[in-house]
Design a protein with these regions (language model features):
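Tubulin/FtsZ superfamily GTPase core signature
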Residues: 1-209
Length: 209
């Protein structure tokens, strides 16, 4: 995770990503981009971004404009929005590191992110009684102002409590991927956690957008 537009993040992030990739790591970068009203910082960020993207398997652009828009929609302080970014990354790490009923691993992620085009991380959380609201939150969650319509690849993990049913998984997955390319490669996982009772969480890596 880095903030572009200043000195340290802009100067070091691309090199750190390059070194990590040299060691065989799967490199997932999340880059915060400055407001449009900050032309100098925007210029610095634009110069740094190509190096970071070239050395990352997935590079998620986080627009401060989009973050502020999300906050207005949710009627929250926009600075609290940084917590959403952490939730995105935490959700992905949990997906890959935890044992589930249907497991996902790094090979699954590599299969998805190797699709041509951009990629993004998506997360949505809500009540298990209203799975459609989870999908709606997930579709509105990207912080880099992209659309998942026509996406070519999707790795999706559904997390829930012991009350999660097969119908929850089917409804969430089918609804979420309905706007993607008909030939979209979809890899699905599922995980049960006692902490998620009464709730559902959808975590997805969407590529080829």
């Amino acid at each position: 995770m880095t903030g572009l537009g200043g000195g340290m993040g802009s100067g070091a992030s691309g090199e750190l990503a390059r070194m990590a990739k040299q060691f065989g790591c799967l490199v997932l970068s999340v880059a915060g981009l400055p407001f449009a009203e900050q032309p100098l910082r925007c210029s610095i960020a634009e110069e740094a971004l190509p190096s970071l993207e070239a050395n990352s398997d997935v590079c998620i652009r986080v627009s401060m404009e989009r973050l502020a828009w999300q906050s207005r929609r949710r009627k929250t302080n926009w600075m609290i929005g940084s917590g959403w970014i952490g939730e995105l990354v935490e959700g992905l790490v949990t997906t890959l590191a935890s044992v589930g009923r249907i497991n996902l691993d790094l090979m699954d992620m590599k299969a998805i992110i190797n699709k041509n085009g951009n990629a993004t991380l998506i997360v949505g959380t809500g009540s298990s009684e209203n799975p459609s609201s989870v999908v709606e939150m997930a579709r509105n969650s990207p912080l880099n102002d992209v659309t998942i319509e026509g996406a070519k690849g999707c790795m999706i993990q559904v997390e829930g409590g012991p009350d999660m049913t097969l119908s929850h998984l089917t409804e969430l997955t089918d609804t979420f991927v309905s706007q993607m390319d008909p030939d979209c490669q979809v890899i699905m996982g599922a995980r049960v956690s006692d902490e998620m009772i009464g709730k559902l969480r959808l975590v997805a890596v969407v590529s080829g957008i």
